């Protein structure tokens, strides 16, 4: 008599799934955490809502209205979720039939697009970016048949560069009436002039992902947003959980999106950009660094000689970076979150020692 294990009972695609390797899941015992693109210091908030015996609103009014005002869109064009990662999954659940439809994304890029699709049983198609990490529009066009959702991260994680806006327009024309184009703007606060939020009126099939995890310094809150036209938002509302944000999360998010909160966020952005330029300049003078790539974000991608040895050496010293060697076209690359000046100096000193 054959014995069926619990694993045997699981869906085949889940048994075969490689989970997303988040910074926390990868672990480490460091005191300089530069692997998750977080803000380096905590921002303090005081809870003002104490009615924790009641369920929260599905879409907290203050959060939606504050974010709409900040993003320059209508409240009806905003959906708030448990991080932008939930937004990624909601779009697949709303628009893709498992076993029939596909998503498309352009590596090297963020890993959750594929994990979300594979979990649901939706095909993933990839069109690697060009050598300059811009979109291969011909390659995308050739693979669009059957694709319902296209994910484009801009600024792109982990490369740090913006996607050419004209290429975005071409992509939106290629997909009109065929697929949803999702612009992942998790890092847009570091280059706000590049946001596509103003394009929503022109492109009904455009959706934009945002988060409070980066410039707003609230990675531990798990609060993200999807900006889209009302028809898209209404469909997402059909598949979202009934209470995606807890009352404390909604309380803090509303405070972070107040006029004072926006001012504080922009001050943090200015500080991070200044520190980024300092770190880029220093990295370019270190001999174990082969190349430092331009960045529009709060992290820097660099290519190293003997990157695995460098990564381990810094890891052993408590400096935790993000290894990108397994990403397409990123052999020898490590990603470094921009931290405090003290943290930058720890990295610089450790890398200089690698030259000996």
From Swiss-Prot:
Homodimer. This is Histidinol-phosphate aminotransferase. Keywords: Amino-acid biosynthesis, Aminotransferase, Histidine biosynthesis, Pyridoxal phosphate, Transferase. GO terms for molecular function: histidinol-phosphate transaminase activity; pyridoxal phosphate binding. Transmembrane segments: none annotated. One of its GO terms (biological process) is L-histidine biosynthetic process. It holds the Pfam family Aminotran_1_2. It comes from Shigella dysenteriae serotype 1 (strain Sd197).
